[in-house]
Amino acid sequence: MFKTATCLTVTLAGLTAFAEVGSIRMGEDGIKRSSASAEERLALIAPVAAGVLRCRPTFCSCGVCYGAPARLEGVRFEYRQAGGEWTTADDFTYFEETRDYRGSLLGLEENTDYEIRVAQGDKVLASEKTRTWSSEIKIAKTVTLDPARIKFPLEIRDRGNPTGWIRYTMPSGKTIVNDTDQPAIVLDGAQFVVLEGLKIEGGKASKSIRLKGTKCVRILNCELYGWGRDSEVKYDGLGRPFVPGSPAPTVNRNANGGFSMKGSKGQISGDYAIEIDRGCCETVIERCYIHDCRVHANSWYYSHPAGGGAILARSPDHSTVIRWNDLVGSDLHRWDDAVTSGGNFSEDGGLNRDADVYGNFMIFANDDCIELDGGQQNVRCWGNRFESSLVGVSIQGCMVSPVYVFQNGFYGMCDQFGNAGQTVKTGGGAHGNEAYAFVRKNLFWGDGMGMIWMPLLRSQLKDNVFCGNQKIVRQESSPLSSSVGDRFGVEIPEEGLSGNLPVRPVGFRLSRSRFSGITVKAGKVEPGALSFSAKSTCDRPLGFTIAKNRDFPWFNVIPETGVIPAGGEVTFTVTFDTAKMNDRHFYRGAFLVRTAEGLSRAVSL
């Protein structure tokens, strides 16, 4: 079983436009808002009652809500490890509509008891004890799957318990090949179940793994690729993918550039490898390599992207964790979003509430690397590396809040045609009336628009680094937003980008994480070869394998397998196959130096 303390302990203080989008309205002031009634909003937000302190921990964070009929003078939110010294938490905000305080505790220790209290002066108004999650779980039963005997979809309804999880795995070196039009696995009402070490290719359904009404399901160290429906592009259908043989839709455009479309039944949207459905809670997706969807999402050059991606969060109830995954698209099979939301402008949409997204590598989306749109109630996105996509993180449709975006690296935003959008997207849709976004200590590097301030979204920026021309746009439109300690116009050479992003407990670091400027002229590649090294940061040898998408046959990495000695170093060479570099304008790719545990460092080209 994987343990986070193996080499390093980490502690740090789409479908969008086509389905399940909450309705919005344009106010007389020209500002977009949710069209839901106050009663409907409260039902979806599910605020706590007056005097109630609700704490929802994950591995290293805890979402906290405290019900209060009115704003309290001098109120403090404090926490400590059991028996330790009290620490006052920052960024707890009172919300008039729901009559509660909300905020998150960050940088907690895994598998640790904490005490949390609300205090005013010398009086303790409420207190709770909680415990953060553990990576180590007790397995009561292991089911070893035989790929040759699986009937698709494999339906799992098992119910383990907190002291006895049920694990599904398979022999190493085998592959589950799904050649049907059904998902490979459907978990329906399953509880305390682990999928670990599965390698699944196919099938022709819109999903590979579906979670329906589950509690405490973990998907660990799996590889998913080659799923998605057969498709063809209809350029008279806004350039989007359609089921082959579908009639072309009728598109009517208006003077403002908008459009309506009829006859779009065959359009393909939402082909995501993993779907977390409404009602699921305490889901973990960790150390997975998801790549090579069969559907290519169109660029905004034609219309709003449609196609596929890696993970779809369709309003799970609470406590979803997506960590340490590699979600790698390609120019031949771009993601729509790598991670997308269902119910973008709904108060319970997207990841909804009390969720963590950290330590992930997401690359090659024609829209967003990750779409947090929806509730965003104590949703935290940190320590990730977002790259070569139109948008890094979308927090538009922040309907409840607070949302936290911090310590991420945004590298070279671009769609398949090289166009860049907002690096952190806020504009284009509605926000909640009291929405807060805390955006801190992020690196905005390379192409990208930076961030736009919106009237209803209180963007609290602090200590971000904006390189090149990236900046904050329309600051005058949001007088309640702030920028403190942000730096602009900073120049950082590509070779100076950290090899430690995304943040992961992996026992080595890379001397270089990104190479750009690769050109092909007259059958020659410049530069002819690239080199970098991996240096150990732990006291044991680490075996590795180079992992790359099937869409990247035009380069090779040597050595492909090997061992990084304890305290030692391995040098790698990237070479190019010019015979396979004659069919496109751009050659962009990525690969992973990946351990058997599923942890990796990524290099992009």
Language-model features: locations:
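Recognizes extended acidic, P/S/T-rich segments that occur
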Residues: 76-111
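Extracellular beta-strand-rich solenoid/capping regions of secreted or surface-exposed proteins
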Residues: 107, 148-167, 176-218, 230, ...
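Extracellular beta-strand/beta-solenoid scaffold signature
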Residues: 180-185, 204-210, 233-277, 298-317, ...
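Predominantly extracellular beta-rich ligand-binding scaffolds that present long acidic/polar faces
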Residues: 404-502
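Long, low-complexity ectodomains and other extracytoplasmic segments of secretory-pathway proteins
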Residues: 503-543, 596-605
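Surface-exposed binding patches on compact interaction domains or structured appendages
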Residues: 506-519, 537-575
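A short beta-strand micro-motif common to beta-rich folds, especially ectodomain repeats
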Residues: 584-597
